[in-house]
Structures are given as structure tokens and as C-alpha cells.
Amino acid sequence: LFEGDKQQKYAAYRRLKSSGTAHEWQQLISQQRYQDIDFNKIAGRALSILTNSKFLENHGLEDKFAQFILSQESAKYTGFVYELFAKPMHKKYQRLLVDKQFTGLINTAKQNMNRDSNFIVCVDTSGSMTCHACGTNISSYDVAKAMALYFSHLLEGKFANTFLEFNSYVKMHTWSDKTPTEKFFNFNSSYVGSTNFLGVAKLFAELKSKGYDESDFPTGVICISDGEF
């Protein structure tokens, strides 16, 4: 990219980053003005990268970031919902960021969604779902669970905060924890049995017999499976 040896290239790179070509926060980092960084001006993906590295810790920014993210109702994020849960979260502020970014995704969806349709996610929890999902760094089950959590926040009425699980049997679950990260990490399934998707229809028939009105039912089911039927 730059002429000269490695040291010269790095110096040229730093000059580029400290110029008007880079984002403001990148310029501040290059100038070592870490305390002047405005986290609100950093894109969601970049913020995730910074908080999942040792950058905040190494530059004494952990408390500042924790105060910032606590003060936010939501946070920006433009990635896929499952990507939010793909990294370990050893720090409280990492979980707080994911919670706020998840809320941001939900708020965006509610602003643009078709109110005449709502979907409940049905998660395959048969044994094969523990395998790595192609194109990601997490399992098929974790991708499905993240999608189930996302769509459950868009449901209303009797099915609000719920999702379906199927293997040899079908169950309906209600998330029991408060925050998105608590819900995601505290819920686990037993990876057993086969894939009995027909059981989903039987479950809705049972719910109707228990007094659920068809008008309360979701308008559709999103089945998330690795396809090993």
C-alpha cells in the first residue's frame, strides 16, 4: 500500500488515519486522544470490535464506556442478530452493549414491520444442530436460538416472548429472564431425538382445544433447522 520499509509504511498509515480521510474516532485513536472519543459516533460493528478486544481496557476507557452504554436506550447495529451472541462476553459492558444493540434491532423492525403478519420461530433441537453453521463461527442451534429470541420480541398477545422447539416432540417456551443476553445464555435445550416437524401442527391443535383463539395465533411459522430430516 505504501512505499518504503515497514516502519515507513506504518508512519504513512498513521498520517492517513490522523487526517480528514479517516473517521473522527479513528483520527483520535491515531492521535492517542483516547479520552476524547465519542462512542456515539462509532458505527455498531466497529463498536462491537472495540469492546470485544482489549482496546478499552488498555486505554482506561472501560468505565467511560460502561457509563455511556448505560445511558443509552438502544445502540446502533447493522449486522445479523446471531452475530451479536457469537463472541464471549466476560465483561458486564460487553453484555450491556449487546442488550442495547438487540433493542436497536427490535425498534427498527417495529418501525418498519407489517402489522398484519407475525411469525413464531420453531427451533430444531435434534442432535445434528450442535454442528457448526456454515459461514458463521457458532452452531446451527445458536443461530436458531438468536432468531427465536428476535422474533419473540415482535410477537404480541398470548404468544409474546415465546418460541417453539422441536425434536422428537414439540414444546412452546416462554423466555424467563429479563435481558436479551440473559435469555440467550440461560436457556439451553437437550439435543435429542429426531425432527418431528409435524408435531408443530398438533401443538397448535392442542392449544386451540385449551381455549386459544385462532385469531391469537401467529400468522406463520419460521422453522430453523440444519435440514437433517
Positions of the model-derived regions?
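Catalytic core segments in nucleotide and nucleic-acid processing enzymes
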Residues: 145
